[in-house]
Structure formats: C-alpha cells, structure tokens
C-alpha cells in the first residue's frame, strides 16, 4: 500500500509504504460456470435477494431455488435432466442471477406457454436476445400443457402441503457439531421441497400478469399505461399475508397511543429497553398485540432468505425502531387515513372480469407460501447459528458468525478436519463488503462486469420507471440506502430506496409514496403499496443517487415517473 503526492513542479513524491494486511478474498471464488451463449438477468431474483449473499446462503437458498424450479418444470412435462449442478440459477461476484435461456425451455415442451410470457413474467418485457426454442410435437406439447394447467389450478393443494411441512419441521440447534450438522443434512430435502411447493403455488401468479398485460395491449408491446392499469387491477386483492405486516404494526401503535407511559417508556427509550418494556406486563394490550404480531410475523426480516439475517423474533431491534418511528409520527400527525378501495372496474373486459378473482387468489396464495418458505428457512437459520456456536466453542471456527462463510458441504469438511477452511471463511467475510454494493447489467451473456447504473429519462427530464401502484403525490423525499436509515422517516414523505422487501413493511404506514431503483409489479413493495393505496414506481435505476433527502419531488404512479417538483 503506497501513498504518494505530486509537488508543484509535477514530480511524484513517495510518502509512505506498508504491507497490505486486509485484502478481501477472491470476489469470484464461488462463481458458477456460465454458458457463453446463455442470457442471464438479476430481475426477480435480485428483488427477492438484493445484494450479495453469504456462501452458506448460496449453497442453501441458491440451490433451493434451482431445485424448486427443476421440480416444477418436470411436473409440467419439461424433460429436465437430473444434475447436481445449477441449471436455472447462477452466481457471480456473490450475487444471484436467473438463466433466462434455460428457463425459456418450457415454451418448447408445454402448450400455452411461450418464451415471451416467461420474459414478461420475470423482466416485465420480452427479451429479443433469447430465441424461441424449437418446439416438440403438438401431441407432446398438448399433454404437457394439460399437466401445466393442472399445476396452475392446484395452488391451494400446494399451499396446504407447505403448511403441513412447516408444522412438522424441527431441526436441532444444540449438541455436538457432528450431531447438529448431521441433523441439518438429513433435513435439507425439506428445504428443497419448500422451494418446490412455493414455486408451484406461485406459478399461477407469475403466469397471469403477462396474460393481463397481453389482453390490455391487444398483442402489442405493453405501454406504461398498460402496466399501471394492471397494477390497479391487482390492487383489489384482499387478505394478503404480507399486507398484514404493515397493518399489524398499526395495531401495535394503536395500543401504544392509548398507553399513558408509551411516549417515555417506549418512544424515547433505547430499542433494547423499549422491547423489554413492551414485553412486560406494564405495557398491557400493546404488549399482547406485539406477542400476537411476533407469533404471526416474527420469522420475517429484511433479506429474509439470507441465512445470516435473523428474523424479528430473534432480533427484534429493526421492528422496534420502526414502531418507535411510527408512534412518534402518530403523536405528531395523527392516524393515517385508510386507503380507499382502488380496485379497477373490469366490467368492460369480459375476460378480465373472470381472470381478476383468479389473479387476486394467486397473489394471496403466493404471499402465504412465501411466508411458509421463510418459516422453513428460519428453522435452518437457527440450526446453522447453533452449529456455528458449537463449532466456535470447539475451536473449529473463529466465531459463530463464520459459519455463514462456508458452504454446507465445507462445514462438513471442516468438522472432518479440513484446517484451511477457517482462514477461507475469514477471507470471504472480508470479500462480502466489497461484493454487496455492486451493480450489474439487467441482461448479460457469459460473466457480468460490475457497472455504474445509467438513468432512463422521459421527455421532461423525469426519471422513468415502471408504475406498479396508481396515483400521483408531491412531497419531501427521504432517500434511504439501508433499513437502519429508514428510522428517520417522517410522516408524509416519499420513500426513495434501492429496493424494499418485507423488512421495510412496518414503515409503509408513514410514507406517502414509494420509489425504488429495482422492482417489479409482483415485488413485495409493489404488493403492499397497492394494498395501502400508495403511489409507487419501481425500476427507476438511479433514484437513490439522483435525489437527496429533503428534495420536493413528484411521484407519478400513472406514468411511472419521478421528478423534482
């Protein structure tokens, strides 16, 4: 590491030099081997798992997604070969990507499916770089099409099967490292099954969105207005599991407002002390409401399929901070008006009138099974954390957090005596900080290169994104890069964030609108924004760098734009 300066004459002067001791590990150490002819994307998977993942998460979540997709394709009649490798998921620089080329093979074997529908479901548009696969015989496609249709209408059964799996799953988290690892290993098939059932129950939701767009666009490329109209149609879904995360937080705040000591004992307290008070008998109905909330939603969190990330039941501090912000806003500004029913009248579209109830049911099913999948993941999070503690206590790892920086297979090898893995885990932990903020092209072949995102602008200089919840609002911007920064949100501000997953939901009762760099019509933020009647635009790419907190901005959820007011 050499430090230098240039003097007035232009001569270079060396100031000091020292050995570099904290270089990260290889950022591409665990990269998968790409097929140079295949097209990859971060769409969909980058919304579900934004940023880089730990090696353990790659070996469980990444593989779980891939196995779930393989099984759902086989059920639909696609002849997917048995393989130990990944077919539909890739990882580069620690980030997960989907292989659109292999995913498009469903259109070759299943009647009623097409490459275009698959691309619209994942990326919101057709991808011309992917050729339409050569199709098999009509008879074979018809038979597979009937199997695929049966799969779409069997979502309720898949939901029940996942509920039963969740109810029966128990993975030990204490004992000797060998015993914990063996218990985890013997139960991994439950993770693969959970992903399969979630993807099967979600398939109808993914299939219906491009169908609705196609009907509105009458076979042409869908416009911003078509995307906005579909978003308004989807807003009619009721009883969505993830929407209750925000509504449940509101119920806790309702009880806190009624408590005479809440402003001192909760709102102004340290988050740890506030949680302890809320769990005590002194908090009364507010504490009872929190207990019910954690029973239903305690497994949820930001980046909740990352095994290193604890749920709210195990680390309640992010939830408590959001409740404190909500209580302070309620005291200053009063309760937020309930959103009006914004569901569209589809009576002019006979086909849409029949499809909308099915689409709403599909959204409810997808969000319910996503919650079940996270419950399964949480059981393994706790087991792996227990394994990390046992390995650290036994001198096999430097600390329990290091467990997340070895793959599942490598953990077994470390228990078996492979010494160098301890140092490898430390190196990967340093690499994660370098991998996390990287951005990549939406589409690429071969290996991607990190890039600086470029804006897409409309005629008036406004940032152009995808409208996912209708309405227009003007207000002060709150630019938030991390969930921790969201604690500064004030009532009525427009939240501008890289992406919002379930961990951000408790703040939705504060904001007046939502703008994100990344997202789609079925991403979590879009679903909850529609339920709350919030204007929302996603896929703005550079909103978090273009705007600053305090800017007066106009968010147009009809046109899909964000600009200075």
Where do the language-model regions lie?
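Generic, ordered loop/turn and secondary-structure boundary motif
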Residues: 21-24, 41, 46, 50, ...
């Amino acid at each position: 590491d050499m430090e230098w300066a240039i003097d007035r004459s232009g001569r270079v002067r060396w100031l000091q030099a020292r050995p570099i001791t904290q270089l990260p590990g290889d950022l591409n150490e665990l990269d998968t081997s790409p097929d140079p002819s295949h097209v990859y994307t971060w769409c969909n998977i980058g919304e579900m798992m934004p940023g880089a993942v730990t090696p353990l998460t790659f070996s469980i979540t990444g593989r779980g997604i891939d196995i779930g997709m393989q099984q759902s394709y086989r059920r639909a009649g696609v002849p997917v070969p048995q393989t130990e490798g990944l077919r539909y998921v890739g990882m580069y620089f620690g980030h997960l990507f989907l292989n659109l080329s292999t995913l498009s093979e469903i259109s070759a074997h299943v009647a009623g499916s097409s490459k275009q529908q698959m691309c619209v479901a994942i990326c919101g548009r057709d991808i011309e770089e992917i050729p339409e696969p050569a199709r098999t015989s009509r008879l074979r496609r018809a038979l597979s099409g009937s199997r695929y249709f049966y799969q779409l209408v069997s979502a309720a059964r898949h939901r029940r099967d996942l509920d039963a799996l969740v109810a029966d799953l128990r993975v030990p988290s204490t004992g000797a490292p060998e015993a914990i690892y063996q218990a985890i290993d013997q139960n991994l098939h439950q993770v693969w099954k959970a992903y399969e059932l979630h993807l099967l129950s979600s398939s109808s939701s993914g299939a219906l969105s491009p169908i609705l767009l196609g009907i509105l666009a009458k076979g042409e490329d869908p416009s911003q207005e078509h995307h906005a109209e579909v978003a308004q149609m989807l807003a009619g879904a009721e009883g969505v599991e993830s929407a209750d995360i925000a509504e449940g937080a509101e119920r806790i705040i309702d009880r806190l407002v009624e408590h005479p000591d809440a402003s001192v004992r909760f709102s102004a307290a340290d988050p740890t002390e506030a949680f302890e008070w809320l769990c005590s008998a002194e908090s009364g109905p507010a504490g009872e409401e929190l207990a019910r909330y954690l029973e239903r939603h305690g497994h949820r969190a930001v980046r909740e399929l990352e095994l290193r990330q604890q749920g709210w039941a195990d680390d309640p501090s992010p939830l408590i901070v959001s409740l404190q912000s909500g209580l302070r806003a309620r005291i200053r500004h009063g309760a937020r008006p309930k959103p009006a029913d914004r569901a569209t009248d589809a009576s002019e579209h006979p086909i849409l009138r029949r499809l909308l109830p099915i689409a709403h049911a599909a959204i409810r099913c997808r969000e319910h099974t996503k919650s079940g999948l996270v419950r399964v993941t949480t059981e393994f999070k706790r087991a792996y954390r227990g394994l990390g503690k046992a390995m650290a206590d036994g001198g096999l790892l430097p600390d329990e957090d290091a467990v997340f920086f070895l793959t599942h297979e490598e953990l077994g090898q470390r228990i078996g005596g492979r010494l160098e893995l301890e140092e490898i885990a430390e190196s990967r932990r340093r690499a994660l900080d370098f991998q996390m903020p990287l951005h990549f092209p939406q589409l690429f072949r071969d290996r991607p290169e990190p890039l600086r995102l470029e804006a897409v602008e409309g005629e008036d200089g406004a940032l152009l994104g995808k409208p996912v919840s209708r309405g227009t609002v003007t207000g002060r911007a709150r630019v938030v890069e991390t969930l921790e920064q969201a604690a500064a949100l004030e009532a009525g501000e427009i939240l501008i964030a890289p992406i919002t997953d379930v961990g951000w939901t408790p703040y939705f009762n504060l904001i007046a609108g939502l703008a994100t760099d990344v997202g789609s019509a079925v991403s979590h933020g879009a679903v909850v924004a529609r339920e709350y009647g919030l204007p929302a635009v996603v896929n703005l790419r550079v909103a978090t760098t273009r705007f600053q907190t305090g800017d007066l901005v106009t968010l147009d959820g009809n046109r899909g734009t964000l600009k200075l007011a």
